[in-house]
């Protein structure tokens, strides 16, 4: 028979009392009243914050957007097939945040910062809130450094500066994304961190962009944030803010950054869908009243920081898709009024063979002129005016039978300028090459050359300068100014190439 010893029992009880965990966990919990269309109505969650992350029983995350008297409207960040009426919801006490830092470079992530490229977890210790206030007036400096796109038409006539917001606007299939990708590729030697945000695009399109950047060595300094067409509306809505947060981290470290939002039309549509399902009152074109604020608070985060803040910059290139060239619709007019200028792409010009299809007449850069390099500013001053006059004359000359010599000469020069500004995709030019091409056109050095030979002239001149006159390219690239000696070298080079082409003809 086993003897019971009271001292042993008391020792065991004492040990168990000592090991007892007294910690109490308090959770803010609610119950699902209704779920459907990516929206859940939740009862409870009394102390939830606006924009707070909540977690459902099946692990789906949500964002508390509507805080009402008797329920909370939550948008789901996933399919949420496992959520049922009566399921519990737990508030996390956290606002949506994203990992940031060097570890993000070269990666493809979703709007919550989770990897989508199959390269494993992102080893980043830094985290930043997705929504952040924009820098204040005192923290900013006026735009004064150029952001070279490598596209002659833009760098010469619609220059973009670091810290600027320049809208790229046009119908579908007019080359909007191509301009953005060219700009990223052109930053290879500029030490600029790039963020490409794909909103509501086909997965195949995002894969194609990723491959193009990888082939050209641009993925090493680029982060891709993708919220595809099949993703929840909440993720498409959040994607641009995630891109801004990733770029902000580098901006506040004193680096230059470039963010492409491709495109904000789809983000506005996702926000409209969420707002209507949350029963918010619709306004013009059924968009909610705060859709302007949705875009303005995003684009105001782009800035050129003051010296005291570390001299960093964030340049934003938002893209907007128009319907049949209508720039007077609600979202296009909103974004035009927020940004510092726009590059307007025309489907008529695109179909006529002018690529990039930039309509120079209504494209403008409101602050970039201050950032333009002296070398190209000096020679491109008349370019925009000459092209505008050419467009006017070309329309007039269709009805006029006999034109005087001066008008014919002006039309001839306009045609040559148009040809000079044609540029193949994924082939950005050096500043020195742009200077040489624009100089040849505006100074009338190509007036004798047949129009069909202009494209060949551009190719020959670039090769000639690289092989025979590297001192010209080095001088322009380093000094950013056209000296008298450089001008003499360039004039001689242009004459050599033109005479060679005329002899061949």
From Swiss-Prot:
InterPro entries referenced in this protein's UniProt entry, alphabetically: ATP_synth_asu-like_sf, ATP_synth_asu_C, ATP_synth_asu_C_sf, ATP_synth_F1_a_nt-bd_dom, ATP_synth_F1_asu, ATPase_a/bsu_AS, ATPase_F1/V1/A1_a/bsu_N, ATPase_F1/V1/A1_a/bsu_N_sf
Entry's localization field: Cellular thylakoid membrane
Membrane topology: Peripheral membrane protein
Residues in the signal sequence: none
Domain of life: Bacteria
Site note Required for activity, residues: 363
Enzyme Commission number(s) of this protein: 7.1.2.2
Record note on quaternary structure: F-type ATPases have 2 components, CF(1) - the catalytic core - and CF(0) - the membrane proton channel. CF(1) has five subunits: alpha(3), beta(3), gamma(1), delta(1), epsilon(1). CF(0) has four main subunits: a(1), b(1), b'(1) and c(9-12).
Biological function: Produces ATP from ADP in the presence of a proton gradient across the membrane. The alpha chain is a regulatory subunit.
Enzyme class, first EC level, given as a word: translocase
Protein name, UniProt field: ATP synthase subunit alpha
Originating species: Synechococcus sp. (strain RCC307)
Principal location listed in the UniProt entry: membrane
Catalytic activity: ATP + H2O + 4 H(+)(in) = ADP + phosphate + 5 H(+)(out)
Binding of ATP, residues: 170-177
Listed GO CC annotations: plasma membrane-derived thylakoid membrane; proton-transporting ATP synthase complex
UniProt keyword list: ATP synthesis, ATP-binding, CF(1), Hydrogen ion transport, Ion transport, Membrane, Nucleotide-binding, Thylakoid, Translocase, Transport
